[in-house]
């Protein structure tokens, strides 16, 4: 971007995630900025002084394919990856190590979910560490570790494949509950109208600074305010909410719809087309 600015070349930038403008920063202000939703649009204006006419809201391009839905029937998909089609499915997206000074949560949650009479898939992040040292994988639980590894010696040197993304689409489409921390998994769950249970309890008493910090961040506050997720602050509450959601998946439907409206802006599967249209406009090819 620096070289482009020096050379007088127009810069079109895109915000790739909901936390980019508040937990990171724009060092160079582009000529035009593409964003997912009006929340990020307002952040670009209030935090960076960008004029509204230089910001284009397009939705979330990554979700375009999700609107077509699964291509493999539920029973066939379950059997393919080793799940029992007769049982419900819970997906756990780990908290990850970087969200705490010491990750004492992920192992605790996995051990708790192992006692469920349900299918449980732990969907690990492709490029973040998750400490579960000493944990023996429960036999009825699947550990899904996505990503093509480029170099085993460098942690995180991997990239999601189309097959990884397709598997996630099917897991989300067919699951009955999503358990997660303050991550984009909350939007994933809402997009498929799946109950969302947020983990905010710990095996021992911790100081506030040692807990999961992102629940207090600006980018996650709209999720908490939406009414589309329950935040468990004790093991008993976690188990109670878990069974409540599995019995009544319709709970908090309106809140999940609000998450989709606020975070995805348009749920029409055409976000990528709007990105292309913006780039063509920047090149002077409007309507091409």
Regions flagged by a language model, labelled:
Residues 1-68, 96-99, 128-129, 167, ...:
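Active-site and donor-binding regions of nucleotide-sugar-utilizing enzymes
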Residues 6, 173-174, 191:
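Flexible glycine/serine/alanine-rich "lid" or loop that lines and gates the nucleotide-sugar donor pocket
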Residues 9-11, 120, 196:
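Hydrophobic beta-strand scaffold residues
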Residues 28-30, 50-52, 177, 184-266:
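Catalytic binding pocket for nucleotide-activated donors in carbohydrate/polymer assembly enzymes
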Residues 63-158, 232, 264-267, 271:
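Conserved catalytic-core segment of nucleotide-activated headgroup transferases in glycan assembly
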Residues 157-164, 169-183:
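Acidic donor-binding loop of glycosyltransferase active sites
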Residues 268-288:
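C-terminal alpha-helical cap of glycosyltransferases
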């Amino acid at each position: 971007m620096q070289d482009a600015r020096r050379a007088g070349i127009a810069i079109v930038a895109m915000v790739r995630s909901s936390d980019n403008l508040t937990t990171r920063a724009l060092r160079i202000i582009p000529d035009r900025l593409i964003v997912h939703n009006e929340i990020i649009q307002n952040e670009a204006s209030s935090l960076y002084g960008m004029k509204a006419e230089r910001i284009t809201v397009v939705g979330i391009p990554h979700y375009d394919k999700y609107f077509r839905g699964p291509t493999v029937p539920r029973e066939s998909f379950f059997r393919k990856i080793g799940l029992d089609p007769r049982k419900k499915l819970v997906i756990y997206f780990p908290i990850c190590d970087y969200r705490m000074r010491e990750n004492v949560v992920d192992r605790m949650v996995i051990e708790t979910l192992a006692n469920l009479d349900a299918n449980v898939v732990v969907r690990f992040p492709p490029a973040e560490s998750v400490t579960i040292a000493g944990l023996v994988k429960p036999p009825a639980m699947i550990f899904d570790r996505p990503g093509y590894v480029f170099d085993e010696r460098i942690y995180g040197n991997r990239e999601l494949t189309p097959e990884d993304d397709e598997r996630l689409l099917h897991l989300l489409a067919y699951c009955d509950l999503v358990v997660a921390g303050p991550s984009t998994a909350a939007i994933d769950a809402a997009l498929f109208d799946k109950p969302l249970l947020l983990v905010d309890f710990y095996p021992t008493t911790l100081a506030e600074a040692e807990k999961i910090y992102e629940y207090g961040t600006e980018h996650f506050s709209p999720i908490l305010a939406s009414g589309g997720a329950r935040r468990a602050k004790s093991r008993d509450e976690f188990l109670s909410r878990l069974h409540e959601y599995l019995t009544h998946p319709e709970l908090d439907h309106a809140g999940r719809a609000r998450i989709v409206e606020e975070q995805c802006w348009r749920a029409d599967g055409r976000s990528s087309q709007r990105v292309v249209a913006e780039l063509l406009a920047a090149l002077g090819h409007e309507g091409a």
